[in-house]
Amino acid sequence: MSGNTFGKLFAVTNFGESHGPAIGCVIDGCPPGMTLSVTDIQPDLDRRRPGTSKFVTQRNEPDAVEILSGVYEGKTTGTPICLLIKNTDQRSKDYGNIVQTFRPGHADYTYYQKYGIRDPRGGGRSSARLTAPMVAAGAVAKKWLFEHYGTVFRGCMTQIGELPITFESWDFVPDNPFFAPIADVSALASYMEVLRKAGDSCGARIRVSASNVPVGLGEPLFDKLDADIAYAMMGINAVKGVEIGAGFASVAQHGSSHGDSLSPKGFKSNNAGGVLGGISSGQDLELSIAIKPTSSILTPRESIDMAGQSTEVITKGRHDPCVGIRATPIAEAMLALVVMDHALRQRAQCGDVTVNLKPIKASI
């Protein structure tokens, strides 16, 4: 199938192109009776929105969301919710020089080989602009999960290019354009300014977490919670790696330290990242994603044209020197969509299950 729908019971179908009239999504499976308006969705879109600082693309899109269906008198009806975001600041002429060439690192070549046709305007369907509808859908999921379980999603940047970022406090994340958990981002700004002047780009590492996640979410064997989390994160543009819990550091750990000990007072560690056997443990979901450097750069690079001949490509237009800067709200949204889908699946299959053992605390 065509791969434009994410989720099973909370299913989100994404539509649109970067330079088309609009982008959006249809959410099928949202429970009825939840209060919902654009004010519940717009704040997350504003966090992802382009043109908010000199360190991101200067494409100035308001990303104003419209609710076209699925809400009546301020409440969800249980029918499909259509969310629409109009494109207002396209500059398709910026892509005239690449109509007959393939940009290195982009989906131009593979889209053409697969479909026999491609939309060169801003990458068309492969553009990161299509993450905006997922952020909108994620806001709906976040609201339902918070109201039912108190679940809270957070994210921050922990590395940009070669610069590691030491975590100080979540409180600093909303106050700077990097979503960095530090008070002073001057070193990050200087680093990005050097890259911008050089016409180059860099990657980033993003941490995402969810707290107050109910125990029991996940469907072994093949729809494990962590499997679906990894699947969701890899669906984000430019993501090339996912770690859950201790991740690749687990290789150097011993079983005596990696296994998260349980006590009557709670878990003593969280190397598993909140998932055991593919099922949520009630601990915080903890993960990190690796984002590659932006492929659209001013540095000349070797490629081929539509005839297979050698050519040189210089990408013009307005692009993020580090796509990881705006990835935090996107990753939060995708995690929320996974948790939401599994919460509904758990309620459907195991809603009547009771056990005598009360869940222990997520941490001591």
UniProtKB/Swiss-Prot annotation:
FMN binds at R125, S126, S127, N237, A238, G277, K292, P293, T294, S295, S296, R318. GO terms for cellular component: cytosol. Its cofactor is FMNH2. Keywords: Amino-acid biosynthesis, Aromatic amino acid biosynthesis, FAD, Flavoprotein, FMN, Lyase, NADP. The keyword Cell inner membrane does not apply. It is an enzyme of class 4 (lyase). This is Chorismate synthase.
